[in-house]
Amino acid sequence: MNLISIPAFQDNYIWVLADDKDRCVIVDPGEAAPVLKAIEENGWQPEAILLTHHHNDHVGGVPALCAKFPHLEVYGPQETQNKGTTCVVDEGQNVLILEWEFSVFATPGHTSGHICFYSSPYLFCGDTMFSGGCGRLFEGTPEQMYQSFQKINALPEETIICCAHEYTLANMKFAASILPEDRAIQDYYHKVKELRAKNLSTLPVILKNEREINLFLRTDDIDLINKINQETKLQQPEQRFAWLRSKKDNF
């Protein structure tokens, strides 16, 4: 199988999984034009669309794609039912498309009904996790997002995380400001700066690496706890997660 990212808008990525027969699955098509262009250039035959949440920069291209390819099944959470979804899915369900079986995880936080799709080794996480960071909490709570991160962190370390936005540079600048002495964070921040200076993508990423550089996965890390303790005493990892999210919101 082939994993392809299609840039959209200013910093979105629309993900495509294609098999050796050029059949493909499209994830979070926020706009149709770049997807239709890629379909024509690669000779793909779209079979299905996966939606992680209802925001327009993830669903805006669905009507045009379904008009062009009327056979498309569109899988998404309840909150996308009025965005073109033909099959509503939720936590614990499995979706079989071609040779891929996608497990569905409920990951509330960014939105209340956000979901992720996992088909080893790929995780399509929408706006739940970004490299070095996490999604803004528009509808959910820090506690919900913390639990969503625990689900992702329970996946195998070789999981390939397909985030929906190129936010890595800003996230690593924030992480480096929190733990300026952390070698893994500083090294990755330097690597990301080099990639973005060349206008190269930083995605996808591997869960094993995220565990080292993503502070939102390190809420039990002693260095982070000591940093937070300089300002306030927080006993629970959910509280430290909320502290990080608040700091990032105001960074």
From Swiss-Prot:
Keywords: Hydrolase, Metal-binding, Zinc. Zn(2+) 1 binds at H53, H55, H110, D127. It catalyses: an S-(2-hydroxyacyl)glutathione + H2O = a 2-hydroxy carboxylate + glutathione + H(+). Its EC number is 3.1.2.6. InterPro entries: Clx_II_MBL, Glyoxalase_II_hydrolase, HAGH_C, Hydroxyacylglutathione_Hdrlase, Metallo-B-lactamas, RibonucZ/Hydroxyglut_hydro. Coiled coil: none annotated. This is Hydroxyacylglutathione hydrolase. It comes from Enterobacter sp. (strain 638).
